[in-house]
């Protein structure tokens, strides 16, 4: 039996296609985050980037996402040490922490359907910036709520 590439290679050793395939397409990294100025704690909101399609959990303009004016961050191998802000289910983060990827990950199941069924995507769970008045009302992981 062949060992999956993500189990035998480090993130630095992966090809560009392998690297890109680690993204499960959950859309969580497309949610706006707020940072506590005192503690540097990162809080996820349910406020999505205006380019996120909330049905497919994909960018509406993926090829131009870094030049669209949005705050889309490119995940690169030289920034692995900064991956702590990614969702705790993210393959990039998990592999950078020497942890296994989830059983519902599309690399294991062959499709995104298991991820959506497990409730691990943002499908139909977001609001858009234009509809938000008080961003703090949209914090998902606030410790005091």
From Swiss-Prot:
Name-wise, this protein is UPF0260 protein VS_0923
Q: Member of which family?
A: Belongs to the UPF0260 family.
Q: What disulfide bonds does the UniProt entry report for this chain? A: none
Task: Tell me the superkingdom of the source.
Answer: Bacteria
